[in-house]
């Protein structure tokens, strides 16, 4: 029995040494060996199994190889509890720091470059994190509520969520195109197009938003038309009143000036003050005797008011010229002020004399 155990121990040591050198004894292949159950045999079998599993897991997405560093990077992203951890920046990071972090991570975790399991989800998480944090409004809302929105695994759903309540308004693929023009800056690697339910959700949500916006615009159109009509209503009322007033108004029977367009072409004078005025061809038929006398009183009053206003304007003009001549010591202005005639004032003096004499 002791001899048997000694032989088994020697064979176990040889087997472990062969496993470590990645080869087996030529005379005893591992398939035909039945381990004895001792600690050394079990340890050797466990090391062999671990090595085989690691060799299998190095075959990533799309049967492409990946490095241990890439796998650890994907695992780090999946363990992150907020967008700041995903990008590896502080909560007070500036826009430039966010862009720098995104460029670095997007190139590192793009599925066409990183084939480790979960690289696609990690890449989408990076894009979503940058799209939210680079938007001031979304970042403010995320800072207030985002820490409560951790990743979770819903029943009958895939584990990847990455803060679905704070989805970006742009897909990770579109965001990558914005930064790198659809391909890597250092190679001719075309963009991947992995259309998942996140992309579908994004398109469906924005299609619903556009439809809702169109409905709201259509509902607002009648209200906008009504508001515009209410605003224009006062203007329309003024225009209508003005037109009606002009239609109902009658032209006066006289004019102090010659107006051929209105038919005031016949010249006349008042009997008392000899004030000139103009009438139309039908004036004599309408005004005679007392009616003519009353009308001429009205004409004289209007004429005196007109002459008084004109006289005041002439005096005002002469006074201003005199003041300017004294202020600037301008002899030319002084002469012009002195030569200015007050014709309407002279007419007014004559009318006052006639009224006193009458």
UniProtKB/Swiss-Prot annotation:
A GO biological process held by the record: cellular response to misfolded protein
This protein's UniProt keywords: Chaperone, Endoplasmic reticulum, Membrane, Transmembrane, Transmembrane helix
Effect of residue 110 to Q: Loss of colocalization with SV40-induced foci upon SV40 invection
Domain J span(s) in chain numbering: 82-146
Gene Ontology CC entries for this record: endoplasmic reticulum membrane
InterPro entries assigned: DnaJ_domain, DnaJ_domain_CS, DnaJ_subfamily_B/C, DUF1977_DnaJ-like, J_dom_sf
Topology in membrane: Single-pass membrane protein
SUPFAM superfamilies according to UniProt: Chaperone J-domain (SSF46565)
Primary location group: endoplasmic reticulum
Keyword Transcription regulation: no
Cellular location(s): Endoplasmic reticulum membrane
Gene3D superfamilies to which the protein is assigned, alphabetical: DnaJ domain (1.10.287.110)
Transmembrane domains' residue ranges: 228-248
GO molecular function: Hsp70 protein binding
Pfam families per record: DnaJ (PF00226), DUF1977 (PF09320)
Primary role: (Microbial infection) In case of infection by polyomavirus, involved in the virus endoplasmic reticulum membrane penetration and infection. Regulates the recruitment of DNAJB12:DNAJB14 into SV40-induced foci and all cooperate to guide SV40 across the endoplasmic reticulum membrane. The foci represent the site from which SV40 penetrates into the cytosol.
Listed name of the protein: DnaJ homolog subfamily C member 18
Biological source species: Homo sapiens (Human)
Gene: DNAJC18
């Amino acid at each position: 029995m002791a001899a048997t155990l000694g032989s088994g121990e020697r064979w176990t040591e040889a087997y472990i040494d062969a496993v470590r050198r990645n080869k087996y004894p030529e005379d005893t292949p591992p398939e035909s060996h039945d381990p004895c159950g001792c600690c050394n045999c079990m340890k050797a079998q466990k090391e062999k199994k671990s090595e085989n599993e690691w060799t299998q897991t190095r075959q990533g997405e799309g049967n492409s190889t990946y490095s241990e560093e890439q796998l650890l990077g994907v695992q780090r992203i999946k363990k992150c509890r907020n967008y700041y951890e995903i990008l590896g920046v502080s909560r007070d990071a500036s826009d430039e720091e966010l862009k720098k972090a995104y460029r670095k991570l997007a190139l590192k975790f793009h599925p066409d470059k990183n084939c480790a399991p979960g690289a696609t989800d990690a890449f989408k998480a990076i894009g979503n994190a940058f799209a939210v944090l680079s938007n001031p409004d979304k970042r403010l809302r995320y800072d207030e509520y985002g820490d409560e929105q951790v990743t979770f695994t819903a029943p009958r759903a895939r584990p990847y969520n990455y803060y679905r309540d704070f989805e970006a308004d742009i897909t990770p693929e579109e965001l990558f195109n914005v930064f790198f023009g659809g391909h890597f800056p250092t190679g001719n690697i075309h963009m991947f197009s992995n259309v998942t339910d996140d992309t579908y959700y994004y398109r469906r949500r924005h299609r619903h938003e556009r439809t809702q916006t169109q409905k709201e615009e259509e509902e607002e159109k009648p209200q906008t038309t009504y508001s515009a009509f209410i605003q224009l209503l006062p203007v329309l009322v003024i225009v209508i009143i003005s037109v009606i007033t002009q239609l109902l108004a009658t032209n006066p029977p006289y004019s102090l000036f010659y107006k051929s367009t209105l038919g005031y072409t016949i010249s006349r004078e008042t009997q008392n003050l000899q004030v000139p005025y103009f009438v139309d061809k039908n004036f004599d038929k309408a005004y005679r005797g007392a009616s003519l006398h009353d009308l001429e009183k009205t004409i004289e009053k209007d004429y005196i008011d007109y002459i008084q206003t004109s006289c005041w304007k002439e005096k005002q003009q002469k006074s201003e010229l005199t003041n300017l001549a004294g202020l600037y010591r301008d002899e030319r202005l002084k002469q012009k002020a002195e030569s200015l005639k007050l014709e309407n004032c002279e007419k007014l003096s004559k009318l006052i004399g006639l009224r006193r004499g009458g």
